[in-house]
From Swiss-Prot:
Motif segment (Twin CX3C motif): 40-66
Domain of life: Eukaryota
Biological role: Essential component of the TIM22 complex, a complex that mediates the import and insertion of multi-pass transmembrane proteins into the mitochondrial inner membrane. The TIM22 complex forms a twin-pore translocase that uses the membrane potential as external driving force. In the TIM22 complex, it acts as a docking point for the soluble TIM9-TIM10 heterohexamer that guides the target proteins in transit through the aqueous mitochondrial intermembrane space.
Protein name stated in the entry: Mitochondrial import inner membrane translocase subunit TIM12
Species of origin: Saccharomyces cerevisiae (strain ATCC 204508 / S288c) (Baker's yeast)
Disulfide-linked positions: 40-66, 44-62
Record's keyword terms, sorted: Acetylation, Disulfide bond, Membrane, Metal-binding, Mitochondrion, Mitochondrion inner membrane, Protein transport, Translocation, Transport, Zinc
Subcellular location: Mitochondrion inner membrane; Mitochondrion intermembrane space
SUPFAM superfamilies per the UniProt record, alphabetical: Tim10-like (SSF144122)
């Protein structure tokens, strides 16, 4: 976000295309974060009654390991996808219709 608010580049305008890309990146990051949160919560925190207000040492270690593994695998898969040149515009024929619909929906707001 500092890219958009950087005072050193005050004369530079931000294009709508860059804002759209930033929005897609934010949505992807938010989705990844929520996926990590729900997966690690399900795996590491017991569902029965909570005896303590804080996490136990075992729960903390479990969450740390879980988040590290999820982050590592996400980076590994992302790197693989980038090296293979996979992109929605190449492999997903309906992507351009999706992007056009998203932009149209956003402009109505």
């Amino acid at each position: 976000m500092s890219f958009f608010l950087n005072s050193l580049r005050g004369n530079q305008e931000v294009s709508q295309e860059k804002l759209d890309v930033a929005g897609v990146q934010f949505d992807a990051m938010c989705s990844t974060f929520n996926n990590i949160l729900s997966t690690c919560l399900e795996k590491c925190i017991p569902h029965e009654g909570f005896g303590e207000p804080d996490l136990t040492k075992g729960e903390q270690c479990c969450i740390d390991r879980c988040v590290a593994k999820m982050h590592y695998s996400n980076r590994l898969i992302g790197g693989f996808v980038q090296t293979r040149g996979f992109g929605p515009e190449n492999q997903l024929r309906h992507y351009s219709r999706f992007v056009a619909k998203e932009i149209a929906d956003d402009s109505k707001k």
